[in-house]
Structures are given as structure tokens and as C-alpha cells.
Amino acid sequence: MKRRLAALSCAVASPGALGQSAVVYGLVDVAVEHVTHVGASGGGLNRMASATGSLPSRIGFRASEDLGDGLSAVVVIEQGFAPNAGTFTQGGRAFGRQSYVGFVAPWGSLAVGRQYTMLYWSILDADILGTNIYGSGSLDAYIPNARADNAITYRGTFSGLTVGATFSLGRDSVSAGSPAGTNCPGEGSDARECREWSALLKYDSPAWGAALAVDQIRGGPGAFANLTSSALQDRRLSVNGYVNVANLRLALGLVRRDNDASAVAPRSDLWYLGALYAATPTLKIDAEAFRLAFKGSANRATLFAGRATYSLSKRTALYATLGHI
């Protein structure tokens, strides 16, 4: 089945200050899309996107306190919402995008709470379209939802080299039946149940960058996606890189997945190749191609997507995006 998809939207980011140590920030992104070749009839439909057009809508609160000697205490709570209906996203959580407290120092950051895993940080600069409605998340829904509840994280950057790790005692306490709610709270007597861990090695410079990350989640009784036992694992290996030439960025990456819960085709490779071109200070054009293939199976998927973004100001932009799968 082939589909053509398009969306036109307006995104508004609204940072504001509560004081020297506290900030309220946010972004509202509303998109209307037209989808062709839907269902057995092959008809089309028009709808308003609920999760994202180009960037997911959110409102967040960030506070910090200087403790001296380069050490600061930080707290972040960030809520995701669907502006078309005014409902919470991330499985209905009140602060589902991020919710953590920690410390920041010259040696890096250490935090506890609901946070991004290292898979998210590994692809942030190489996956050109990112959380766009037509992007890597269309083929692997975990990628834009790479977060873990009950997580302990460390991340530090030293002369362009970033290292990081996460460990979650119970990766997902919500039973929404979506990638953001897979009913695996963990923290029981089984030491492996619903655990998550990830590790990151990343280098960035003005001319180029590369990243390597591993992300592994374990199952538990009642967990969704057939990960119903702590003996079952879902692992992803992310390798990518990018180069910058004048106003152009080119990027290539791979996410290899080994999913114990899939008896038919446990291994899959998701390749992506993208380009971002800053045509003018106010106009950016980006495009990306994706190829998902399963080992030992004829199942394949190819996605092509492009986007043009025009900035009306530092905080407001219009964009149009097109996808074909």
C-alpha cells in the first residue's frame, strides 16, 4: 500500500522568565494533513494531527539553584499535550515528556526521574526530520518515545566528546497501550523485570559528528508488545554521523533492533539518509529517506519525506511537509 501525506502548520515557541533561577517554556504546533490511499477503498481523508506536525507541543518548567564551586541543583517538569483536543500525550501523564531532579557540574549532569534514554541523544543531530509527523517514528514508534520512568542518568561532555548512561528500575508505569504507555512498572521482586539501560558515546565538532548508542528494555508480566517476561529483551543499536558543509548538513544513520518478542523476524534494520539546507536566514529545507527491512522476512517499508520551514520571527514559523510511504 502506498500513501501520500502532507501537512501545513504553524508552530509558536513561548519562553518566559519567572526569575533568575526559574523559566517557563513551551511550544504549540498545530497541523492539518491530507492522507491518500486509506483503507481498502483507497480513499483520502483530512484530519488534524494530534501528536505532532513538526515538533511535539509542550509546556515546561525549569529551575536551578547555584550551590557554589560550579555545582547547581536543577529540576525539570515538562508536559506534552495535543493542541487539537487539549489532551495530555505520553500515555496521559501530567508531565510525561520529562520529570526529574538532579545536579549539574563541570563533570556532567546526574539526575533521577522520568528522562530521555541515550538513544534519543544519539540520533538528535543525525536524524534530520526528527519528530516530524513523517519521519523515523513512522517506522519505529519507540524512537521519538525513548524515555524511561524511574531512571537514573548521567551525561557529560568533554572537548566535544559526550558520554552518557541511563538505568531504569521500572521503565514504564502507564498502561495506555501506546509506545508511551506499555504497562511495565517493574520495581518488583524480579531484579530484571521492566528494567531499561542505555549507553552513549558521541562526538560533535563544527564540521562533523558521530554517535554510538545501545538501548535495551526488558519485559514483565502484563507488558504490551508481547514483552511479557523479564527474560525477553528489546535491544536497539544506533550508529550515525553527519557532516556540515557551508549551509548544508548531510547525515546517515542506522538503528538495528533485536526484539525477542518477535518470533518471526526478531532483527530489523532502519536506515536513514537526510539533508538539511539553510537556503536563507529564514528558510530551511530538509529531506530524508528511510528504509526498514526485517531479516528473514519479506516485510519492507520505504519512506520519503521533505519539509520547508519559514521563520516569521525567532519564535514563530510556518512549515509544510510531504511524505510518501
Which residue stretches match the model-derived regions?
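Outer membrane beta-barrel
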Residues: Q20-H34, N46-G170, K202-P206
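Residue-level detector of the transmembrane beta-barrel scaffold of outer-membrane proteins
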Residues: V23-Y25, S72-V74, S109-G113, T162-G164, ...
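N-terminal signal peptide c-region/cleavage motif recognized by signal peptidases
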Residues: A13-G16, S21
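Bacterial N-terminal signal peptides
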Residues: A6-A13
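Gram-negative outer-membrane beta-barrel proteins
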Residues: V32-A40, F81-T87, M118-S122, R171-S175, ...
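Detector for outer-membrane/organellar transmembrane beta-barrel domains
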Residues: R192-Y310, G323
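Transmembrane beta-barrel strands of outer-membrane/channel proteins
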Residues: V28-H34, V75-Q79, R114, A165-L169, ...
